[in-house]
UniProtKB/Swiss-Prot annotation:
SUPFAM superfamilies: Mitochondrial carrier. GO terms for molecular function: amino acid:proton symporter activity; L-aspartate transmembrane transporter activity; L-glutamate transmembrane transporter activity. Its main location: mitochondrion. The gene is Slc25a18. This is Mitochondrial glutamate carrier 2. The modification Phosphoserine is found at residue 150. One of its GO terms (biological process) is malate-aspartate shuttle. It is found in: Mitochondrion inner membrane.
Amino acid sequence: MIACRMSSQDLSITAKLINGGIAGLVGVTCVFPIDLAKTRLQNQQGKDVYKGMTDCLVKTARAEGFLGMYRGAAVNLTLVTPEKAIKLAANDFLRQLLMQDGTQRNLKMEMLAGCGAGICQVVITCPMEMLKIQLQDAGRLAVCQQASASATPTSRPYSTGSTSTHRRPSATLIAWELLRTQGLSGLYRGLGATLLRDIPFSIIYFPLFANLNQLGVSELTGKASFTHSFVAGCAAGSVSAVAVTPLDVLKTRIQTLKKGLGEDTYRGVTDCARKLWTQEGAAAFMKGAGCRALVIAPLFGIAQGVYFIGIGERILKCFE
C-alpha cells in the first residue's frame, strides 16, 4: 500500500512538472514580443526612443526584422520550462502541505504557499531574466548609439566594434563573461530585486487565482473548465502584474548591464528607486505596466489552463 501511494505521488509530481513546463513554452512563444517591448520601454531614460508598445514593436520589426522581436527568446524557452514547473508545482505542493483540509479555503495559508513558490522559482528566474534583458535591450542601445553618432559625428561615444556587440549579443557569451569576471554572483545580479517582485506577485496571484477558479468548479467533475481556468489565470495574472510593476521596473534597470549615453547606473534597489523618483518622477515606476498585463495575463491563463487540463498526466499514461 505504501509503495503504491509513493508511486502515485511521484507520478503526480512529475505530471505537475510536465504541465508547468509545457504551459511555460506555449505562453512564452505567444507573448514574447510584448515582453521585449516592456523591457525596452522600462529602460528608456531621458528622450524616449519609443512612444509606446505599438511604436516599439513596429520600429523593432522595421529595424531588426520579425526575428528581432524574439531576441532573447531562446534563453526564455530554454529556462522557462524548469522555472514555470518549479513555480506551479511548488505552490501546489505547499498548498497541500499547509492546508488543514483540502476543501477548506484558507487565505493566509494560500498566501504563504504563494510566497514559498516565489522564493523557489528565483533560482531559475534571476539568471534567466539577467541574460534575457541584455539580449532584449540590445536593439534599443543600437538605436541610441546611432542617434548619438548622428548628433555628434565628430565625437563617437561608442567604438565601431561596440555596434556589432549591441546588435549581435550572445547569451552564451554574456553568461561566460559574467562568470569569468564576477563569478556566479554575476548571473544573480538583481537577486534582491527579483525576490521583491516575485514574492509579492505570487502572494497576490495564487490565492486570487484559486478563489476565482473555485467559482467555476463543476459539481459533476470537481474541476473547472479549461475556459474558466484560462480566464481566471488571465484575470489574476493581469492584476498581479500591474500591482508589482514598480518592482519590475527597478529589477529591469538594475539587471541591465550596458547603458546608453547619459543613462544612470545603480548600486542597488534603494539607489535605483531614489534616482527614478527624483529624475523621472512617479510615472516612471509604472513604465511598461500595460505590456506586463498583456504578457502575464495570457501567460498564466495558458499555464493554468494546461495545468488543469492535465496534459502531463495524459503524457505519462502513454508510457505506462
